[in-house]
Amino acid sequence: MTKKLEGKVALITGSGRGIGRSIALKLASEGAHVVVNDLDEAPAQEVVAAIRAAGGQAVACIGSVTAPDFAERFIGTAVSEFKGLDIIVNNAGYTWDNVVQ
């Protein structure tokens, strides 16, 4: 039986932990090829390893969504590794260094 997202390519920011990790694992379980992102390499690689262990395809793209070159590099990873892009989940967040009033 074909999975719902078979062959689709998904980018997920902030997917090394928490909700982003859960989204990455779910999309992969539905057949999507996943590009995992996190600021830290270890959590991102753990998610990639979990997806691969379950028979899915995934790669990591480490970096901050606030970096000027990030979007191009993130999308470039999807295109070079999986030949396309179908789904983007913007799960990453950031905070200001000051109190917001």
PLM ranges: what are they?
Residues 54-57, 77-90, 96:
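A glycine-rich helix->loop->beta "capping" turn
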Residues 30-46:
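Conserved glycine-rich Rossmann-like NAD(P)H-binding loop of the short-chain dehydrogenase/reductase
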Residues 36, 61-62:
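Conserved residues in the N-terminal Rossmann fold of short-chain dehydrogenase/reductase
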Residues 3-35:
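Canonical Rossmann dinucleotide-binding motif of NAD(H)/NADP(H)-dependent dehydrogenases/reductases
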Residues 47-55:
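Short, conserved SAM-binding/catalytic segment
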Residues 67, 72, 95-101:
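Conserved mid-core segment of classical short-chain dehydrogenase/reductases
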